[in-house]
Amino acid sequence: MNPPAKTPWDEVGLTAGEYRLIVDILGRPPNHVELGMFGLMWSEHCSYKTSKRYLALLPQTGKRIVIGPGENAGVADLGDGFVVVWKIESHNHPSAIEPYQGAATGVGGILRDIFTMGARPIACLDSLRFGPLDDPRVRYLVGGVVAGIAGYGNTTGIPTVGGEIVFDECYRDNCLVNAMCVGLLVGDRIIRGRAEGPGNPVLLVGNRTGRDGIHGASLLASREFDEKAEEMRPAVQVADPFVEKLLIEACLELSGWDGLVGINDLGAAGLTSAASEMASRAGTGLDLDISRAPRREAGLNPYEVMLSESQERMLVVVKKGREGEALDLFAKWGLVAAVIGQVTDDGMLRIRDRADNPTDGAPGELARDASAVGVTGAATALRIVAEIPARALAHDAPAYDRPMAEPAYLAEVRKLDLDRLPDVRATGAIRLGTADPAVGPPAAAMLRRLLASPNLASKEWVWRQYDHMVRTNTVVLPGSDAAVLRLKREEPAESKASTAGAVDSVDSVGAVGAGRTAEAPTRGIALSTDGNGRYAYLDPFLGGAQAVAEAARNVVCAGAEPVGLTNCLNFANPEDPGVMWQFRRCVEGLAEACRVLETPVTGGNVSFYNETMGRAIFPTPVVGMLGLVEDIDRRMTAGFKRTGDAILLAGETRQELGGTEYLKLVTGEVRGCPPALDLTREKALQAFVLEAIRAGLVRSAHDCAEGGLAVALVECAFLGESGARGLEADVSAGAVPKPPGIRLDALLFGETQSRVILSCDPACEPALFDLARGRSVPLSRLGAVSDEVFVLRSGSAVVLREPTSELARLWREALPKALESRLAGTRFVRGDSTMTTVKGDDQ
């Protein structure tokens, strides 16, 4: 039987009901170009038609937040004249099809969201998810994605300073690539993406328009994959970081020019999105002559021009009569720019093209002749090829209340009978050779297995490929709890700023940027991305809350006050009621944690349809946290500093093994209830740790998370300074209940939340215990830092004794061994992610 013929709305990812609504809005059937434009803007990726009713639950205001959701990125005032812009977004589907270009264009897109607002990008982070490394295709994806991130970030001169990378079976078919960027405002103005002032000219700047990326938002990113997914490769955009670098400098110079009205990047949905959003935000219209759009190739029809997602392009509105100055500025930077239209006052997005340019023969074209509006020297033989209310495209997509139901799998996977799981044993607890199946493996052997697992092993192989020191502001390198950057003044190339049009004087929105003092301590920011898909799979509410708590805890461990967050919510098909239930519960968990921890959400991204032929990813919320380091000299790192320092545990250890890396390693399953999270205790813990750091009472601080207490302690030793890379510690200290009421594997490898490992001069212990009591935070002494031997006890029993150097070697070599031996001869180059074999000196 032949499959049913596709309807015109099917071809652009719309439903029959949505098509009827479009007919009602226009008062007529849409033509082919208009239907394609609606397909883009009403896609799940662009319109948030399923998610926006739930995203409204997230707190969006805070004492330092200047701009929340709705603009290109969030904005926070950090005081002393520093204004920071930051956002995270996904590029999952393109990266799964074409890993190098998908990842590279993901970085490029998030950079443009930042410098569009007048901020210089100063750092990138990435949160990555892949399938198991025994799969050759997964290894190909890992190599391509990492190379794409490195190739784009390194070329544009933006340091990639942190992130995370996780491997799990559920991401085998659908990898996740979430890119975050942070920028520092140049001058004292936030640039808005608004097309204000009827009669003002509109410029298209940057790369020439090509056929790459067509249907990227409507079909590639808004549907689950099937067996024909590879056929969507042309929908993946092509990156050019060299043009992006020129755009950064040109747009930042433009931000200091008094002729600028508004600017928006052409990201997902390309010119259609940028034009409709700029007009809709301002309540205006745009009249564009796309025959004047610079093109990469001949023969592009209006449908292709409006749907193209060619990268490194910006739409700019300037004051009438000042367009020549803008064109000169872009020419100085070697960028192609053209005036393609003007702002109107009728609210319509009107697209014109040459009358002799075919549209591809689609029926229903608007047949009226029309002269160009406001384009000097334009050809007169033009016709209108699309005419749509801008707001209908950008903001009036239908909102769905999709059915939801708790997934049936939860009742089964939450069952965990620990009586059937042999506990690990201490060194020498039984004679070697015992065959009793009820006796578990030695704790030392299990620690080695965990340290060699891809999820816990060192990610240095990844971050060494990124230039994390460019611009020389990175003061805490990748590998610690959070990256820390020094804040330095960013001055505009030209300072002719005015508050006219859509350009806000930052001082006009709450005295932002005021109060600069030369005597103030050097400030910094701490940045972290966090999320645990296993926890969210077992309990979406808890998984959402935990992502916020851990991200905040990480920046606190760096000596920073959490300011706010951006998030990327990665889920499977929202048409599945179980997925919608997961999404709602996860957002509710995020919202609750944000309220309690006072970390408002400034924006982000929702990525649905991360599913292939019924195989769904875990619900994966990723949080990008921004923290303020008031004095960069008080920043904190995870590694031990001096032999003899006391090692303390803030928080309690409970018997919680559900959803842990340890449980997955020994059983091959993700099950049980994930570790509980008491947000009131979490807030008290973070306040205690931050106060202790600012008071100079501690020498190191490290979040105790994936892998549990034993892994966290050994990481502190690995990251320690020379001569302070060992320890002797009692892991039962701080346990609730005390042994023998708690299993040894739970003591060592359980992932109880709200715990931080501290080290300090023994003379500071009394002050720390006093401070902890005042905050009602449990604090226990585990032991002391030593030289090069790693010793763990439970009470008087030695659990394990290992040379730190041997454990460190295993930890550092695990990921390169898993990847490099299999990627030998593989080269990923800009513009082509195909694997090629090279030999000898070429490697």
Task: Indicate residue ranges for each PLM-predicted region.
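Glycine/proline-enriched, intrinsically flexible loops and inter-domain linkers
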Residues: 1-495, 521-843
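Compositionally biased, intrinsically disordered low-complexity segments enriched
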Residues: 498-516
